[in-house]
C-alpha cells in the first residue's frame, strides 16, 4: 500500500512520519506530472494542514485541482486535516468559491481564532476512541449533509467527520504521537 501526500505547503512531512510508523509507504505529490505518475499505485491521498488559500491557489496554478477532484469524486479515499478539510468542503463561509467541494459540509475558516488561540485537548472520536487533538487556528464544520457521519465534537463544535471515503479533521493528528486516525484512514483505503 502507498499513500500520496499533497506536498505543496503545510504539514506533509509530519503525515509521512505517521505513515512510516505504521509501515505504510508514502509519496509526496508536488505537481500534476507527479500526481499522474503515481496515481494508479496509490491507495489514498492525504491533504495536510497549512494555509488553505495558498494551497488552493497552487492547486489551480499547477493544474492539479480538477484531476484530484475527479479522483475523489470517483471514490478515491482522502484524509483532509485542517486546511485539507477546508479544501474538501462543499461550502466555505465568507468565501465565494470552494476548492474540491466534494464533501457535503459547510466550514468556517479560522474558527478557533489566531495562532495564540491554538490549543490542545483530548476527546472521543467515533470508531477510534479517545484521542489527542491539536488545534492551530483550526476550522470548524458548522453543518453537515445527511450522508456525513460526525465522528467527534469539542465544545459542541464538529471537529471530525466522514462521508464515504472522505475523512476530515479540523485538528492536526499528525502533530501528536497517536496513530489512531491514520490507522482509521488506512482501513478506509483497504476497503475502497
Curated annotation (Swiss-Prot):
It holds the Pfam family SNO. L-glutamine binds at residues 50-52, 109, 136-137. InterPro entries: Class_I_gatase-like (IPR029062), PdxT/SNO (IPR002161), PdxT/SNO_CS (IPR021196). GO terms for biological process: glutamine catabolic process; pyridoxal phosphate biosynthetic process; pyridoxine metabolic process. PROSITE patterns: PDXT_SNO_1 (PS01236), PDXT_SNO_2 (PS51130). It catalyses: aldehydo-D-ribose 5-phosphate + D-glyceraldehyde 3-phosphate + L-glutamine = pyridoxal 5'-phosphate + L-glutamate + phosphate + 3 H2O + H(+); L-glutamine + H2O = L-glutamate + NH4(+). Pathway: Cofactor biosynthesis; pyridoxal 5'-phosphate biosynthesis. Keywords: Glutamine amidotransferase, Hydrolase, Lyase, Pyridoxal phosphate. Catalyzes the hydrolysis of glutamine to glutamate and ammonia as part of the biosynthesis of pyridoxal 5'-phosphate. The resulting ammonia molecule is channeled to the active site of PdxS. Belongs to the glutaminase PdxT/SNO family. NCBIfam families: PLP_synth_Pdx2. This is Pyridoxal 5'-phosphate synthase subunit PdxT. It comes from Haemophilus influenzae (strain ATCC 51907 / DSM 11121 / KW20 / Rd).
Amino acid at each position: 500500500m502507498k499513500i500520496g501526500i499533497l506536498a505543496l505547503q503545510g504539514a506533509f512531512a509530519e503525515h509521512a512520519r505517521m505513515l512510516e510508523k505504521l509501515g505504510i509507504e508514502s509519496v509526496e505529490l508536488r505537481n500534476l506530472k507527479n500526481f499522474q505518475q503515481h496515481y494508479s499505485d496509490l491507495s489514498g491521498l492525504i491533504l495536510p494542514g497549512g494555509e488553505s488559500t495558498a494551497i488552493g491557489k497552487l492547486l489551480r496554478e499547477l493544474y492539479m485541482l480538477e484531476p484530484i477532484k475527479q479522483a475523489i469524486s470517483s471514490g478515491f479515499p482522502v484524509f483532509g486535516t485542517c486546511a485539507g478539510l477546508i479544501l474538501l468542503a462543499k461550502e466555505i463561509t465568507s468565501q465565494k468559491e470552494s476548492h474540491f467541494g466534494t464533501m457535503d459540509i459547510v466550514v468556517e475558516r479560522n474558527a478557533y481564532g489566531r495562532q495564540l488561540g491554538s490549543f490542545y485537548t483530548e476527546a472521543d472520536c467515533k470508531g477510534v476512541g479517545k484521542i489527542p487533538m491539536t488545534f492551530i487556528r483550526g476550522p470548524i464544520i458548522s453543518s453537515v449533509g445527511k450522508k456525513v457521519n460526525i465522528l467527534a465534537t469539542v465544545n459542541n463544535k464538529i471537529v471530525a467527520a466522514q462521508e464515504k471515503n472522505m475523512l476530515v479533521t479540523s485538528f492536526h493528528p499528525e502533530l501528536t504521537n497517536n496513530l489512531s486516525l491514520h490507522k482509521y484512514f488506512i482501513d478506509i483505503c483497504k476497503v475502497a
